[in-house]
Curated annotation (Swiss-Prot):
It comes from Mustela putorius furo. The keyword Repeat applies. One of its GO terms (cellular component) is pi-body. PROSITE patterns: ANK_REP_REGION (PS50297), ANK_REPEAT (PS50088). The modification Phosphoserine is found at residues 17-18, 20. One of its GO terms (biological process) is male meiotic nuclear division. It comes from the Eukaryota. Interacts with DDX4, PIWIL1, RANBP9 and TDRD1. This is Ankyrin repeat, SAM and basic leucine zipper domain-containing protein 1. Coiled coil: none annotated. Keywords: ANK repeat, Cytoplasm, Developmental protein, Differentiation, Meiosis, Phosphoprotein, Repeat, RNA-mediated gene silencing, Spermatogenesis.
Length: 475
């Protein structure tokens, strides 16, 4: 019966070019085509046999060849060593044997380290984790970067391995180091949509405000790549998760972070992520994950939670400490109201023109902010309802509020027009008053322009809200 062979090429890990880093190794799981050594081999034959033993994972033959005198640091095509190859295919036993025979865990080829190769290997996280742990136990440096300034933790985060990330940090990996483009491990995880890695990095002290070279934060990178759940989570102002595990010792961290569920199949460990709703994201951001089941059992939505009174918190079994966290978050989310009490009392005769002009300028600026806010909402609002990630209330509620907004803006527009007409009337009367000393022309023109701009801005707000209303009605 013919031997079935699966072949591929082992390439440099971690995003390095396969054209420049191809080591020419054929990999795959082959039937044991290589038998025990039957006699002395020429050096060329011995190297080829060693290479085949490595590709087939024949541990006993590898050991026999090493016993025969072949170097554990043999350099194959493009400078790869046996240990680098073993790490690239996550062969834990082979990595262990080679390390026990004296292989250098800190070897690198053109700044491509064995640890980077292990972190970017194609395999289950369980196998990658074990290989990385072996390399770290032999003093492999977790902060040595490749040519692109990417460190092992960035590769682990990019490929979605939260436990590998945790292990690297426990051994001293810098969680906030940046590559040549300014990407951190958190940025890579957000870019690739790995929610569990994002959460783990925040626990380990990742700074979510570090920007890339083009000025983007991890949340903006997540948004650009359509990972809206991660974007919403990273956009939360309050984040008690940050640095949660930084004060633990290495042993405590490893014990806490490397606990696995034995009931899960090895090939599917850590590979599936729980989808977060708006309630879960809010609670996780406050470190209140333990409340999730309680609130769901009582059918409490995020909207309901955010509008609860103190007696309702207690009635639903929410402790005082948890209440304080929720109320603190609500305080951060409050929108600063315009302090109309500070506006000038224009009825007083001693009010100066400068103060009144300042009032109009502030009002115009507020209108501009409102226009920008509505424009941003219209831009970001999904065109199709199936693209909405988080739970939304009935669109009728939004439409109703938009209708009230349009009505209020229309009323505001009418009042501003009345104000403009009144000021124009006062100006005309003063110009016709023979005892009045005319103001400078440019000042008059400037005041007129301000009033016109204010009126246009208010009308613009009304138009934008009307468009927003139509958009929501289509949904």
């Amino acid at each position: 019966m013919a031997t079935c062979t699966l072949r591929g090429l082992a390439v440099a890990g971690g995003g390095e070019s396969s054209e420049s880093e191809d080591d020419g190794w054929e990999i795959g799981y082959l039937d044991r085509a290589v038998q025990k050594l039957k006699g002395p081999l020429l050096p060329e034959e011995k190297n080829e046999t060693f290479k085949k033993a490595l590709t087939t994972g024949d541990i006993s033959l590898v050991q026999e060849l090493l016993d025969s005198g072949i170097s554990v640091e043999s350099s194959f095509r493009y400078g790869w060593t046996p240990l680098m190859y073993a790490a690239s295919v996550s062969n834990v036993e082979l990595v262990r044997v080679l390390l026990d025979r004296g292989a250098n865990a800190s070897f690198d080829k053109d700044k491509q380290t064995i640890l980077i190769t292990a972190c970017s290997a194609r395999g289950s996280e369980e196998q990658i984790l074990k290989c990385v742990e072996l390399l770290l136990s032999r003093n492999a440096d977790p902060n040595v970067a490749c040519r692109r300034l990417m460190t092992p933790i960035m590769y682990a985060a990019r490929d979605g391995h939260p436990q590998v990330v945790a292990l690297l940090v426990a051994h001293g990996a810098e969680v906030n180091s940046q590559d040549e483009n300014g990407y951190t491990a958190l940025t890579w995880a957000a870019r690739q949509g790995h929610k569990n890695v994002v959460l783990k990095l925040l626990e380990l002290g990742a700074n979510k405000m570090l920007q890339t070279k083009d000025g983007k934060t991890p949340s903006e990178i997540a948004k650009r790549n359509k990972h809206l759940e991660i974007f919403n989570f990273l956009s939360l102002t309050l984040n008690p998760l940050e640095g949660k595990l930084q004060q633990l010792t290495k042993e405590e961290t490893i014990c806490k972070l490397l606990t696995t569920d034995s009931d899960k199949e090895n090939d599917h460990l850590f590979s599936s992520y729980t989808a977060f709703g708006d309630l879960e994201i809010f609670l996780h951001g406050l470190g209140l994950e333990h409340m999730t089941d309680l609130l769901k059992e009582r059918d409490i939505t995020l909207r309901h939670l955010l509008t609860m009174r103190k007696d309702e918190f207690t009635k639903n079994g929410i402790t005082s400490r948890d209440q304080q966290k929720i109320l603190a978050a609500l305080k951060e989310l409050e929108v600063e109201e315009i302090k109309f009490g500070e506006l000038p009392e224009v009825a007083k005769l001693e009010i100066s023109g400068d103060e009144f002009l300042n009032f109009l300028l502030k009002l115009n600026k507020q209108c501009g902010h409102l226009i920008t806010a509505v424009q941003n909402i219209i831009t970001e609002l999904p065109v199709n309802s199936h693209k909405i990630v988080l739970e939304w209330a009935s669109p009728r509620n939004f439409t109703s509020v938009c209708e009230e907004l349009v009505s209020n803006v229309e009323d505001l527009s009418k009042e501003v027009c009345k104000l403009k007409d009144l000021i124009q009337k006062l100006q005309n009367e003063r110009e016709n008053d023979p005892t009045h000393i005319p103001l400078m022309e440019e000042v008059s023109t400037w005041n007129s322009k301000i009033l016109k701009r204010t009126a246009i801005a208010v009308c613009g707000v009304g138009l934008l809200l009307f468009v927003c209303k139509l958009t929501l009605q289509r949904k």
